[in-house]
Amino acid sequence: MEAGGGKRAAPEGTNGAAKRARASESSQVGVGSKLKPCTKFFSTSGCPFGSSCHFLHNFPGGYQAAAKMTSHGGTAVAAPPGRMPLGPGAPNGPPTSSVKTRMCNKYNTAEGCKWGSKCHFAHGERELGKPMLLDNSMPHPMGSMPFEAPPMPGPDIVPPSTFGASATAKISVDASLAGGIIGKGGTNTKHISRMTGAKLAIRDNESNPNLKNIELEGTFDQIKHASAMVTELIVRISGNAPPAKNPGRGSHAGGPGSNFKTKLCENFNKGSCTFGDRCHFAHGESELRKPPAAA
């Protein structure tokens, strides 16, 4: 009986000690293993346990230090104070730490990393262990600039203010021609303004009292048209000859020394004469006159 009792007592005590030893070992593993880096976390597959993992996910020195320690069997290193272990995460996903401790598995692929400089994973070994928020200033070959300069206007774009711009022109003529250019009651100047749309005025010449200035104002096309009509009018008034000694008789007098209607109007034959009956050139053979005899 005593022997049997002794046999039963021994295994019971042994089993109790074994259970206590296993429980103590389990608790020590759960606490002490946090001093070693997790090999799964620093691999491309990642750690499936996340924050419940018994190994360290935030190792000083990042991937290189962890790989060197695990390959050479280094001693356990205490976790730095103030840092929380990383939770589960996948590359290109939301951050779980303020330090880049994992390599981005999209960076060296053909498609590249879509997050660019904002990626929370290291784009190269030089970024391991660096703060994420301070990494945005680094140039990134795969990322695009967050801000782009506005496109500059092309050379073909013309400012709206240049359309229909107003201009002025000045023609200096002999003062004796001013009356003929104006016409009776201003008929000639009014006709030119009505036909071209340009404003016409005759003023004194500042430097020569024997000259008059014909000032034109309007668009470039209006001034061009009005200038041509004024030139044509001057030619008709002067008759392509020096002014007569007695200008008071007028070019329409038809007396000796007058060239009125002595030449055919070139614009009338083209159908473009704008002076009509007031033209100083003949509109057809019926109006043509013989030039006066030379004195």
Curated annotation (Swiss-Prot):
One of its GO terms (cellular component) is cytoplasm. GO terms for molecular function: DNA binding; mRNA binding; zinc ion binding. SMART domains: KH (SM00322), ZnF_C3H1 (SM00356). GO terms for biological process: regulation of gene expression. CDD domains: KH-I_AtC3H36_like. This is Zinc finger CCCH domain-containing protein 44. The keyword Ribonucleoprotein does not apply. Residues 166-230 form the KH domain. PANTHER family: CCCH ZINC FINGER/TIS11-RELATED (PTHR12547), ZINC FINGER CCCH DOMAIN-CONTAINING PROTEIN 52 (PTHR12547:SF154). The keyword Iron does not apply. InterPro entries: KH_dom, KH_dom_type_1, KH_dom_type_1_sf, ZFP36-like, Znf_CCCH, Znf_CCCH_sf. It holds the Pfam family KH_1. Residues 1-31 are annotated as: Disordered.
